[in-house]
Regions:
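Carbohydrate transferase catalytic cores enriched for Leloir-type hexosyltransferases
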Residues: 1-138
Length: 138
């Protein structure tokens, strides 16, 4: 299975003590896990929306994600983005999140961005979209 390949790679790279694979985490425990991270790295090539990015931002964690899908919409302009499969770019972006002034801005603006995605706001926007479709507004 792929998880075994990842664990083998981490061991060969000497990262087995720095990378943790978590499974079956209850939703209520996610904020504490996010808040224990230095940076949330999400180089996914395809996602339906990117809810984990919003969870990280809401937890005050800087985000580094891939370009080319919905992740930029989820993460907003104060997250960092790299091309998929750009290993050097990913490493550089992760390192940038440790720069104190950039990190502070990413955290502050990320928290503000995440507030735009409340359940109430999403429901309002969805209903407005349906209204426009049903009344044929464009």
């Amino acid at each position: 299975a792929y998880i075994h390949q990842l664990k083998e790679f981490m061991t060969k790279a000497g990262l087995q003590d720095r990378v943790h694979f978590l499974h079956g985490i209850p939703s209520d425990d996610l904020p504490a896990i996010y808040q224990s991270a230095e940076t949330f790295v999400y180089p996914s090539v395809y996602e339906g929306f990117g809810i984990p990015i919003l969870e990280a931002l809401h937890s005050g964690i800087p985000v580094v994600a891939a370009t080319g899908s919905c992740l930029e919409e989820a993460g907003g302009e104060h997250s960092l983005y790299v091309r998929p499969y750009d290993v050097e770019g990913l490493a550089a972006a992760i390192a940038r999140t440790q720069e104190p002034s950039l990190r502070a801005t990413m955290i502050e603006e990320g928290l503000k961005w995440a507030q735009r995605f409340t359940e109430e706001q999403m429901a309002r926007e969805t209903m407005e979209c349906y209204r426009k479709v049903l009344t044929k507004e464009t």
